[in-house]
UniProtKB/Swiss-Prot annotation:
<dbReference type="GO" id="GO:0140662">
    <property type="term" value="F:ATP-dependent protein folding chaperone"/>
</dbReference>
<comment type="similarity">
    <text>Belongs to the heat shock protein 70 family.</text>
</comment>
<protein>
    <recommendedName>
        <fullName>Chaperone protein DnaK</fullName>
    </recommendedName>
</protein>
<dbReference type="InterPro" id="IPR012725">
    <property type="entry name" value="Chaperone_DnaK"/>
</dbReference>
<dbReference type="InterPro" id="IPR029047">
    <property type="entry name" value="HSP70_peptide-bd_sf"/>
</dbReference>
<dbReference type="GO" id="GO:0005524">
    <property type="term" value="F:ATP binding"/>
</dbReference>
<keyword id="KW-0143">Chaperone</keyword>
<dbReference type="InterPro" id="IPR018181">
    <property type="entry name" value="Heat_shock_70_CS"/>
</dbReference>
<dbReference type="InterPro" id="IPR043129">
    <property type="entry name" value="ATPase_NBD"/>
</dbReference>
<comment type="function">
    <text>Acts as a chaperone.</text>
</comment>
<keyword id="KW-0597">Phosphoprotein</keyword>
<dbReference type="InterPro" id="IPR013126">
    <property type="entry name" value="Hsp_70_fam"/>
</dbReference>
<keyword id="KW-0346">Stress response</keyword>
<feature type="modified residue" description="Phosphothreonine; by autocatalysis">
    <location>
        <position position="173"/>
    </location>
</feature>
<feature type="compositionally biased region" description="Acidic residues">
    <location>
        <begin position="599"/>
        <end position="610"/>
    </location>
</feature>
<keyword id="KW-0547">Nucleotide-binding</keyword>
<keyword id="KW-0067">ATP-binding</keyword>
Length: 610
């Protein structure tokens, strides 16, 4: 059975892990880093993902995508080099990279994964993540909430009963979950969050400040300059990270722009105090969901035993101070906030494959589910923080006499009116027999699976007629679209492979030309001139092919030159061997010369007995 990997598909960085010898292990990427930037770019038709994509973002901002996770489950499209891509396709490219890195590490093909999502992701965002996995060639065995995964990794070896608060502030999303842990039993009591709050927002307040200060000093608005914006983002992110360890940092961006008077440079000091002032409302925004989760769990801050920090943004001192002040407890720092979610996903993969035993995980649905009823009211069928998997049914009736059908409008959210909540989908139940209003009985059933994905069924109890759907949001992808994207991804993977092979062949040919020139200088005068002329002609043929020939022409010319050089080398060795043999024969023919005090060897054995 092939290995199942655990993937933390993050907004700014992603991480992949696997179970090794009963322990979850993070898989480093080829650059040696344990997390990979969630960045995708296209340059001259070539797809670039991860570290390399992030490095070239400054010079290629229009064809580089960052933080695509923020658009999952929406109809957003990215245009790169003239081609349109959905968030699912961009995410699939990141997943393909992680899959490839895992395969290189394990030395075998990987086809199955457990992928994490923010706990507060709605159904369409979860479905989009699952679709991204499918496009990347992965069967997604389970979608796991990020705070739950973190608790899994943290609680693996813990035997004592404890109530933990997982505070997860990542690059683009924020979640807080309350769990009860007890010897392999993980029960989520409540979860809350904000899908539009993360490290990107902390970067943005620094960027806005830099733009504002630069405009005051030079009268130039950098927010209109795409290349300057990318440099500012990188500088803001670096400053934010620096200020977690030092009290002041210098932001230096030479030649950030130019006007009629010449080039302009951005040089500025940023203190931790100023950064905390700029981001104070963001820190305060994390407290709302934290209070909500505690309230839903029916707990007070004093009843929390441990606070676990997850996500790179929890390194910000003001964030740590806020949660410490709220709970009255020093946050636990025994886990790596960048890696713990992927490690937990690997543990869940181990549970599903049977490699990890005696672990029971009970998660919850983050948002209430229901339908629209008369007057545009949102009628809940399943309340938020209900343990999943779960199902619930309720009987409704018609609102008008002789109503021939009903539209079931499925929603997710907490507001009283349907219009204020998130539409997951709509479907119709038709052919209801004529009857006065209130007489027909229509049973609506909701079913949420362990991935948090919703199935809805409507049944006319009078006729037994039934209609059911698995919710795919209006922004979701149809099966046909997913199949097309899977094929495109496979073709792109094949094209990437061919492009890599072509580069390797060109490099090999180039290297062969260099070594041939070196070899021909060394053998000059030692082999026939005709052989050297033949090799030079073949070498020139390779050079010409490299300048403008097809890859087949390069390969053919390279193989021809390689064979000629090998023949020259063989002849050279044969000549050397013959010369050595002749020298040895000559020495044997004069083996008994008379002693005339001439010593032929390096030394002479003297017989002391004489």
């Amino acid at each position: 059975m092939s290995r199942v990997i655990g993937i933390d598909l993050g907004t700014t960085n992603s991480c992949v892990a696997v179970m090794e010898g009963g322990e979850p292990v993070v898989i480093a990427n080829p650059e040696g880093n344990r997390t990979t930037p969630s960045v995708v770019a296209f340059k001259n038709g070539e797809k670039i993902v991860g570290e390399a994509a992030k490095r070239q973002a400054i010079t290629n901002p229009d064809n580089t995508v960052i933080s695509i996770k923020r658009h999952m489950g929406t109809s957003h499209k990215e245009t790169l080099e003239g081609n349109e891509y959905t968030p699912q396709q961009i995410s699939a490219m990141i997943l393909q990279k992680l899959k490839s890195d895992a395969e290189a590490y394990l030395g075998e093909s990987v086809t199955q994964a457990v992928i994490t999502v923010p706990a507060y992701f709605n159904d369409s965002q979860r479905q989009a993540t699952k679709d991204a996995g499918k496009i990347a060639g992965l069967e997604v065995l389970r979608i796991v909430n990020e705070p739950t995964a973190a608790a899994l990794a943290y609680g693996m070896e813990k035997s004592e009963d404890q109530t933990v608060l997982v505070f997860d502030l990542g690059g683009g999303t924020f979640d807080v979950s309350i769990l009860e842990l007890s010897e392999g039993f993980f029960e989520v009591k409540a979860t809350s969050g904000d899908n539009k709050l993360g490290g990107d927002d902390f970067d943005q307040v620094v960027m806005d400040y830099l733009v504002s200060e630069f405009k005051k000093e030079h009268g130039i608005d950098l927010s209109k300059d795409r290349m300057a914006q990318q440099r500012l983002k990188d500088a803001a992110e670096k400053a934010k990270k620096d200020l977690s360890g030092v009290l002041t940092t210098t932001i230096s961006l030479p030649f950030i722009t130019a006007d009629a008077t010449g080039p302009k440079h951005l040089e500025m000091n940023l203190t931790r105090a100023k950064f905390e002032e700029l981001s104070s409302n963001l820190v305060e925004r994390t407290m709302g969901p934290t209070r909500q989760a505690l309230n839903d769990a029916g707990l007070t801050p004093n009843e929390i035993d441990k606070v676990i920090l997850v996500g790179g943004s929890t390194r910000i001192p003001a964030v740590q101070e806020a949660i410490k002040k709220f709970t009255g407890k020093e946050p636990h720092k025994g886990v790596n906030p960048d890696e713990v979610v992927a490690l937990g996903a690997a543990v869940q993969a181990g549970v599903l494959t049977g490699d990890v035993k005696d672990v029971v995980l009970l998660d919850v649905t983050p948002l209430s589910l229901g339908i629209e009823t008369l007057g545009g009211v949102f009628t809940k069928l399943i309340d938020r923080n209900t343990t999943i998997p779960t199902s619930k049914s309720q009987v409704f009736s018609t609102a008008a006499d002789n109503q021939p059908g009903v539209e079931i409008h499925v929603l997710q959210g907490e507001r009283q009116m349907a219009a204020d909540n998130k539409t997951l989908g709509r479907f119709n139940l038709n052919d209801i027999p004529p009857a006065p209003r209130g007489v027909p009985q229509i049973e609506v059933s909701f079913d949420i699976d362990a991935n948090g994905i919703v199935n809805v069924r409507a049944k006319d109890l009078g006729t037994g007629k039934e209609q059911r759907i698995t919710i795919t949001a209006s922004s979701g992808l149809s099966d046909e679209e997913i199949d097309r994207m899977v094929k495109e991804a496979e073709l792109n993977a094949e094209a990437d492979k061919q492009r890599k092979e072509q580069v390797e062949i060109r490099n090999e040919a180039d290297q062969l030309v260099f070594t041939t020139e070196k070899t021909l200088k060394e053998v000059e005068g030692k082999v026939d001139q005709a052989e050297i002329d033949r090799a030079n002609a073949a070498k020139d043929k390779v050079k010409k092919a490299l300048e403008g020939g097809s890859i087949d022409e390069i390969k053919s010319a390279k193989d021809e030159l390689s064979e000629i050089v090998q023949q020259i080398s063989v002849k050279l060795y044969e000549q050397a061997a013959q010369a050595a043999g002749a020298a040895q024969g000559g020495a044997e023919g004069s083996a008994e010369p008379k002693k005339d005090n001439v010593v032929d060897a390096d030394y002479e054995v003297v017989d002391d007995k004489k």
